[in-house]
Every structure is written in C-alpha cells, then in structure tokens.
Amino acid sequence: MTVSKIEVVADHLVRARRDNTLADAAPLAEALADAADAYAVQERVALELGWFGAAPPRYWKSGGASRDAVLTHAPLPPVGVWTSPARSGTWPFHLRGIEAEVALRLARDVDAALAATLDADSARTLIDAMAVSIELVDSRWREALEAPALCKLADLQSHGALVLGDWRAFEARDWRAQSCRVRIGAQAAVERRGTHSLGDPAFMLPAWLRHATRQGATLVAGTVVTTGTWVGILQAAEGDLVTAEFPGIGQASVQL
C-alpha cells in the first residue's frame, strides 16, 4: 500500500465533494493497486470530511455481481441518509441513478470476534428488521460509471444518497419469488422478480461484518446495511418522484 498515492486519490475526492466539482479518474487509474488501497481512500475521505467522528459508521452498502464475485463495501455519510418520504432538495448530484434495494438492520452489537465465526445462516440471526431502500447513484469522477473499478470503490462505490422506508420485522422469505416495482416520474414502471444478484440480500452479511470490524471496530445494534440493487441502475432526472415497492416488505420514495 503506497500512502502517497492513497493521499492523492483521497485529496481529489475531498476536493470534488467540497467544491461540487468532478475529478479526472484517468490519470489515477494506476494509483490504486487493490481493494485495500480503495478502502484506505474511503477512510481518509471520511476522516477529512468528518463524517463519523470517533464512532463506527451506522450506515453501509454492500454487495456484488454474484456469489462468486468478491463482495465490496462502503460506509455511507449519515447526512445523506434520509427517511421516506424524502426530498432531495438542494443535495448536489451529478448523476441520478436509481437502485431499488432491501436494507437490513443489526439487532445486536457485532465485534471482530463474533464476525469471524459467522456463516450466512448464523448471520441472519443478528438481523431484526428490514426496509425498502432507494440508493441514489452518483459519482465524483468525470468518467462517472466508466471510471476504473478501484476508483469507483474509493468513491463509496458510486454512492450519492440513501432513502429508507419503514422498518418491519425481518423474516425468512422466498427471495426468488420476491417482486419489486419502481416508478420514476412519467416513465413506465419497471417490475422485476427474484433478481437480486446474490439470490438472498442477507448472503453478504458475513463478508460485510468481517470487513466492517476488521480494524477492531464494534458495529452497534441498529447499524444498517443496504444490500444491492434488484433493477440495475435506472435513470432519473431533477423533478422526478421516485417510488420503489417490494410487496410484503414495504415501499420508499424520494422527490428529486
């Protein structure tokens, strides 16, 4: 891990966020050697911008393209986590990508020792609630979603904001039969069924918990993780009302 290169990438992202501008990822494509470097950038940006203080993050995103892929994770700035029905107001966006997701909430504290013992089944017992979530996808890179993968991971895996619907008790579900419906402004509704990339939103829990506690942090009860899109990335525009509904779980909405 080369600290100076991590600092350079982090400084670009900090400046982009502070000035609401875009940074060029192309010159930095070789600056990050691996995911560990990208996570180090995440941490440095969070520290520079004062997102979490001394406490561990309370909101996260986690997921991957398939069960065979390496899952990725990012802590989310709490100021950009909103309760549905939400309004984005003057929140600065360069993109307005829409992902319909399911968020999960921890029922108890989790430290590194507990996280190390978990498999998918035992991790599910640590969850007490679920909610529909809408992740607003954005980028601080001029190349946006075409930026190098590690640059996107360093930029919180292209995170813009998160909207959370009402919480309900977590329960076993047939996720293959679970449907979702997304409406964006005047566009035709998008409907999907059983399309979560991991087959089960809770599949990522062991990997996420080990990642989030790897440096000795304890995640406290009530910590939330949103678990990946069911609809790919849909496109919205300023002025659109976005609604995501998962029958049997709930819905969430945001006015852009």
What does each model-identified segment do?
Residues 184-185, 227, 247:
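Short strand-turn-strand beta-turns centered on an Asx-Gly dipeptide
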Residues 204-233:
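A conserved acidic, glycine/proline-rich C-terminal tail/linker
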